[in-house]
Amino acid sequence: MKADIHPTYHETTVNCTCGSTFTTRSTKENGVVNAEVCSQCHPFYTGKQKILDVGGRVEKFERRFGRRRPGEKVGGAK
């Protein structure tokens, strides 16, 4: 194996915009990483996840094709 090809790991502090901080190891030399989201404030981990209908895609689909009722036949071959 080649010597001196692997980067050195440093103690690194991760600062989140929510105010949470934690320490990990990283190859980042200055020892500080600023993150926008972390496990303390990310909606998936906090249970506050929302499903967004961006741009009204469902409504647009229903306008184009209409809303079908269960058991209603869709137009077929002639």
From Swiss-Prot:
Source superkingdom: Bacteria
Q: Which Gene3D superfamilies match?
A: Ribosomal protein L31
Q: How is the cofactor bound?
A: Binds 1 zinc ion per subunit.
- One GO CC annotation, please? ribosome
Q: Which GO terms describe its molecular function?
A: metal ion binding; rRNA binding; structural constituent of ribosome
Required cofactor(s) = Zn(2+)
Q: InterPro entries, per this entry?
A: Ribosomal_bL28/bL31-like_sf, Ribosomal_bL31, Ribosomal_bL31_A, Ribosomal_bL31_sf
Residues given in the record as Zn(2+) binding sites: C16, C18, C38, C41
> Pfam families recorded for this chain?
Ribosomal_L31 (PF01197)
Function description: Binds the 23S rRNA.
Quaternary assembly: Part of the 50S ribosomal subunit.
Entry's family note: Belongs to the bacterial ribosomal protein bL31 family. Type A subfamily.
Output this protein's name.
Answer: Large ribosomal subunit protein bL31
